[in-house]
Amino acid sequence: MNILVINCGSSSLKFQLIDSETEKCIAKGLCERIGIEGSQITYTPDGGEKEQTVTPMPDHTEAIRLVLEALTNEKTGVVKSLDEIGAVGHRIVHGGEKFAASTIITDDVMKAIEECNDLAPLHNPANLIGINACKKLMPTTPMVAVFDTAFHQTMPEEAYMYGLPYEYYEKYKIRRYGFHGTSHSYVSKKAAEVLGKKYEDLKIIVCHLGNGASVSAVKNGKCVDTSMGLTPLEGLIMGTRSGDIDPAIMEFIAHKEGKNIDEIMTVLNKKSGVYGLSNNLSSDFRDLEDGYNRGDEHCIRTMKTYCYRVAKYIGSYVAAMNGVDVICFTAGIGENAPLVRSLVCEHLGFLGVSIDEDANHKRGEEIAISTPDSKTTVMVIPTNEELAIARETVSLVK
């Protein structure tokens, strides 16, 4: 069965067509600048040339129509007709407390997703637009919603509650939800598989380090804590997001800079993180690593602070699980920045962590980067959120 995986942003749409039998991606692409001048679709069939076409895309329905047209194109398509697409898996950012697992999309499910729009105002409305566009063009094809938040719904109350008046939880469901759940689930399961151990017997910490970044604690196959909160702003220092700060800083900045709450939130989401910390040098870790190696003081400070925060979260999750067996690094930075992994692991001597620097510099494969005598196994596991979404989709429609 071929599964179309859709990830809709407010003005973009990523897609992959995955053969669920072989688990191979047979085509992928990206629609950019939807509803904006200069919109384009990039399409790459497996083993074929990448094609880029600038074409008007006034809305997501037109973007999905172009995706389906590319997949069924006589010359470069990979399926003869839409009948060869067995189901569509949609990435949904926020499922609130309503969804602890993936689900077949019905009218009631769409209503429940819409009720979570307040919790993810940039993402959920776009996710719903993608579902509606697909339903319009593929009315008989089953659709599945896979939630970023679902994996973290096993967190105990003491891990997800904030020290705020309880009425805010009762009225508005203000609590910690966590994100990147599909990645944390895939990577933790893959680590157990690579090690040949039972998932339910392990204590695993996953560090998903991309432009957005989060850490999760997975004990005996269930998530017991994660670093992101009500929104993806909590936790680690990220590309442009601040991560954890003293909440009173917002009032302080408001008085000093004359900014309102929306302007302050823009600073915390778009101008902070390693970008702000590096004196606005870059949010790209390749630039920061170059600067670190050159001895640039801003880059050294930024890299050290970022890695210290990651290590601090790892340490706290060792306490939360009363131990750890495996620490995994994944996502763009976690997979491709050996310097970040080294600097993080320098703080983990108390866990008996010892890194093999040759292994640490290998790329693109599932690998243990700790030495054979390291008391805790440290691994690099490339994430594959699209495959995880396809697997979830197949399990529900078969």
Give residue ranges: language-model regions:
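A mobile "lid/hinge" subdomain adjacent to the ATP/sugar-phosphate binding pocket shared
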Residues: 257-302
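Internal helix-turn-beta structural module
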Residues: 300, 304-325, 334-398
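Catalytic phosphate/nucleotide-handling subdomain of diverse soluble enzymes
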Residues: 219, 225-257, 266, 331-362
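Phosphate/pyrophosphate-binding loops at sites that engage ATP/ADP/AMP, CoA/4′-phosphopantetheine
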Residues: 70-85, 191-198, 314-325
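Glycine-rich phosphate-binding loop of actin/hexokinase-like ATP-binding domains
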Residues: 151-254
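Short glycine-rich, Thr/Ser-proximal phosphate-binding strand/loop in the N-terminal lobe
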Residues: 12-57, 229
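Extreme N-terminal starter segment of soluble prokaryotic enzymes
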Residues: 1-4
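Short beta-strand-loop/turn "lid" adjacent to the catalytic site in phosphate-handling enzymes
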Residues: 71-123, 144, 150-159
